[in-house]
Curated annotation (Swiss-Prot):
5'->3' double-stranded DNA exonuclease which may also contain a cryptic 3'->5' double-stranded DNA exonuclease activity. Also exhibits endonuclease activity against 5'-overhanging flap structures similar to those generated by displacement synthesis when DNA polymerase encounters the 5'-end of a downstream Okazaki fragment. Required for DNA mismatch repair (MMR). It is found in: Nucleus. This is Exonuclease 1. The lineage of its organism: Eukaryota, Metazoa, Chordata, Craniata, Vertebrata. Pfam families: XPG_I (PF00867), XPG_N (PF00752). Its cofactor is Mg(2+). Residues 337-426, 443-475, 512-754 are annotated as: Disordered. SMART domains: HhH2, XPGI, XPGN. The gene is exo1. It comes from Danio rerio (Zebrafish). Its EC number is 3.1.-.-. Keywords: DNA damage, DNA excision, DNA repair, DNA-binding, Endonuclease, Excision nuclease, Exonuclease, Hydrolase, Magnesium, Metal-binding, Nuclease, Nucleus.
Length: 806
């Protein structure tokens, strides 16, 4: 039964542990605790009298677990009933019998669950059940000891005599017997709680004044198997009493218990006598000494105590019977012989190998090879080995001399991990950078004036010439080399800054067009050289990239000046021009004289952005002084594109070329000078900032309409915000535009031209929700509703004006 609440009272002294801490050592086991747990699983069969050995298997699982960790167990069993516990044993026996009868009655009524619970409480461990476990343990070479009376005293004796280094039990009485180390609540994995006697000082409730003797007194006063406690006295009150009392005579302290605790308690003489018997039972209970093979008291008798007067602590039956009882050869109740085990006889059957508790466990053979406690040459404490946590120390070398040579000494060191050697070790840093960079151009010095088509041999020779020539030749990355030279060959035919991979077409179309127009444009090239050379340094810089492109595409042509190109000047103006369509390019090439005439007309224009102004169409302003003079407004589509893109050649169908040069001159002279200067500045800013117009807009015949002075021109809302993109026609919903019936124009986005931005395209082709309101009082320059992207309803007066003008 133990002492109620003792483990919780001294929990500060307990600590978790694992049984492998005692590897190579010996532990004593209270086997009846395992038997009771194992019998709970087969309580119904035991109550019915059916044969079963489940309790044996349960106990052997713990034995195998201890052996697997290298711990040698000694199984200790209870012997005869102690005279001091006759009352306790009698009450327990009556309680078990009552539960058994109740369980049988519930089983007859069909209440199986309630009956099983009653059978569990009625479990009684018989000597025959203990003997079955002893036989199974002997097959594994495990020593077993049957105590003369109680197993608690026998366990304490084995621990005190250093035969067992620890005790495994579920009973807290072991601490009162004076055990040094007790393992409680151990599971099948070997985990449990360990309480050491030297750690009891950690408990704040006990304090430092407690000794082993006072601890035993406290356990007896709080109630134990040998004496029931007084009413209202537990561990707390008993501990308080012993801390307050300074008298070494415990009997006098017990008599004055009410005064110390300030309680109305009367201590009878029977209680004081029972306290004395209980204390002597804890001290002088009979046990069996396996080394001397004698029955001895737990502690030696003092001189003032008569052993015959301690019959309540056990009766000595003699050393011979005590040995046979300890070996398990005699029945403890009838004292009849049930077995003939002789530890001195040689074992004919080797012990069975213990079972491992897991896949990774290896059974330690040191536990089974240790000498038995029944052998003649057994010495207590010889099986105690060093703790596994403490490393094995080498023998001391003090006073010893030895010559040590360090010549062949190889110190342990971390080997540096060497990466696998690269196959392409002859590559230089520049070659590696060139292979993994996309925008870097490397031009090798050309020794020949003309370039030959690249072949495999030429590629290898050029690679050896440009790359690193030092070191032996090793295989290189063929794929990187081929891609590198392919990129170099393509650099001569296309410009990286203006090439669009989304809108570009095959370069073969442009190359064929240029080859067909070489002979026709030879004369125009000479006139263009003279004209462009006068334009200044800005124009030469703009034409520098087309010159490189011409040198690579036409190696057989004679070297040209840095500012010339095989294309018309309007096409080769770098990022400030739009090449237009292939159809328009053919027109400009087929009429070189007309292009040269237009260029000579603006030869006196300053350099820079003003040079590009010569390609800009000035919008004509009508002077109403002459009644017969009138100019056409902007065309429905394409006129604004032609005016905003200086690089595009003028179309023959546009309204701009439908007027004679004399009429244009007279109209321009009649314009207001202030408005003309302001508008010219605005056009210059638009020309320099606006992107190239879309080449997909098809040019339609111009509709000649006269501009009315009554219509006010929409103010520029984005003058301070950079370039404004003006559209050539009102914005229309996607998919509603009528597709042209003629041949689709060829997109020539690969030619150098200013790239359009997404924000500009959104501003140009998106719907405008609120159309600007026209003020009747504000007068301004007339505008075209189509050209300014303003949708207006034509009133009746406007229609009449248009009719009169026509």
């Amino acid at each position: 039964m133990g002492i109620q609440g003792l483990l919780q009272f001294i929990k500060d002294a307990s600590e978790p542990m694992h049984v492998k801490k005692y590897r190579g050592q010996t532990v004593a086991v209270d086997t009846y605790c395992w038997l009771h747990k194992g019998a709970f699983s087969c309580a119904e069969k035991l109550a019915k009298g059916e044969p079963t050995d489940q309790y044996v298997s349960y106990c052997m699982k713990f034995v195998d677990m201890l052996l697997s960790f290298g711990v040698k167990p000694i199984l200790v069993f209870d012997g005869r009933n102690l005279p001091s516990k006759q009352e306790v044993e009698k009450s327990r026996r009556e309680r078990r019998q009552a539960n058994l009868q109740k369980g049988k009655q519930l089983l007859r009524e069909g209440k199986i669950t309630e009956a099983r619970e009653c059978f569990t409480r009625s479990v009684n461990i018989t000597p025959s059940m203990a003997h079955d476990v002893i036989r199974a343990a002997r097959t594994r070479g495990v020593d077993c000891v049957v105590a003369p009376y109680e197993a608690d005293a026998q366990l304490a004796f084995l621990n005190k005599s250093d035969i067992a280094q620890a005790v495994i039990t579920e009973d807290s009485d072991l601490l009162a017997f004076g055990c040094k180390k007790v393992i409680l609540k151990m599971d099948k994995q070997g985990n449990g709680l360990e309480i050491e006697q030297c750690h009891l000082g950690r408990c704040k409730s006990l304090g430092n004044i407690f000794t082993e003797e006072k601890f035993r007194y406290m356990c007896i006063l709080s109630g134990c198997d040998y004496l029931q406690s007084l009413y209202g006295i537990g561990l707390g009150k008993a501990c308080k009493l012993l801390r307050m009392a300074n008298n070494p005579d415990i009997l006098k302290v017990i008599k004055k218990m009410g005064q110390y605790l300030k309680m109305d308690i009367s201590v009878p003489e029977e209680y004081i006598e029972g306290f004395t018997k209980a204390n002597n039972t804890f001290l002088y209970q009979l046990v069996f000494d396996p080394l001397r093979r004698k029955v001895v008291p737990l502690n030696p008798y003092p001189d003032h105590i008569n052993p015959a007067a301690l019959s309540y602590a056990g009766t000595n039956v003699g050393d011979e019977k005590g040995l046979q009882m300890a070996l398990g050869n005699l029945d403890i109740n009838t004292m009849q012989r049930i077995d003939d085990f002789n530890p001195d006889a040689p074992q004919t059957q080797p012990p069975k190998a213990p079972r491992s508790s897991s896949w990774n466990d290896r059974c330690d053979k040191t536990a089974t090879t240790q000498a038995s406690i029944w052998s003649q040459n057994y010495e207590p404490g010889c099986t105690k080995s060093q703790s596994p946590t403490s490393p094995k120390r080498p023998p001391p070398t003090r006073g010893k001399e030895r010559i040590v040579s360090v010549q062949s000494l190889k110190l342990p060191q971390r080997e540096s991990q060497v990466k696998r050697p690269r196959e392409d070790t002859s590559l230089s840093v520049d070659d590696l950078l060139e292979q993994y960079t996309a925008g870097v151009k490397r031009h090798c010095p050309e020794t020949q004036p003309t370039t030959k088509p690249l072949t495999n041999d030429n590629k290898v020779s050029k690679e050896n010439h440009c790359g690193s020539t030092s070191g032996p030749f090793r295989p290189r990355n063929r794929f990187a080399t081929l891609l590198q030279w392919r990129n170099r060959s393509e650099e001569g035919t296309e410009e990286q800054g203006t090439c669009s991979r989304f809108f570009c077409h095959d370069e073969s179309n442009i190359a064929e067009t240029q080859e067909d127009s070489k002979q026709d444009s030879s004369q125009s090239v000479e006139s263009q050289e003279k004209h462009v050379s006068q334009s200044g340094g800005d124009t030469s810089s703009l034409c520098e990239e087309p010159e490189r492109e011409q040198d690579k595409d036409e190696p057989s042509s004679p070297p040209a000046s840095p500012s010339c190109s095989s294309r018309p000047a309007s096409v080769g103006l770098g990022v400030f021009s739009w090449s237009g369509t292939t159809k328009e390019l053919n027109k400009s090439v087929s009429h070189p004289a007309r292009d040269s005439t237009e260029r000579q007309r603006s030869s006196s224009t300053p350099s820079g952005l003003s040079t590009l102004q010569q390609f800009h169409r000035n919008k004509a302003r009508i002077s109403w002084a002459g009644p017969g003079l009138s100019l056409s407004s902007s065309p429905v589509e394409g006129s604004e594109d032609a005016g905003n893109s200086p690089g595009s050649p003028p179309s023959q169908d546009s309204a701009y070329f439908s007027q004679s040069s004399s009429i244009s001159a007279s109209v321009e002279n009649s314009l207001v000078t202030e408005d003309n200067s302001d508008k010219e500045k605005e056009r210059d800013s638009v020309v320099s900032n606006s992107p190239s117009s879309s080449p997909l807009d098809r040019l339609k015949p111009a509709v000649n309409r006269t501009k009315v002075s009554g219509l006010s021109r929409k103010g520029a809302c984005g003058q301070g915000k950079g370039g404004k993109i003006e559209t050539s026609a009102p914005a229309r919903a996607s998919g509603l535009r009528r597709k042209p019936s003629g041949k689709k124009n060829v997109n020539n986005e690969n030619s150098p031209g200013l790239q359009a931005t997404i924000s500009g395209l959104w501003g140009a082709f998106s719907f405008k929700k609120d159309s600007p309101k026209l003020s009747a009082t504000k007068k301004g320059e007339p505008m075209s509703p189509v050209g300014e992207n303003v949708v207006m309803e034509t009133t009746q007066a406007d229609k009449e004006i248009f009719i009169i003008a026509e």
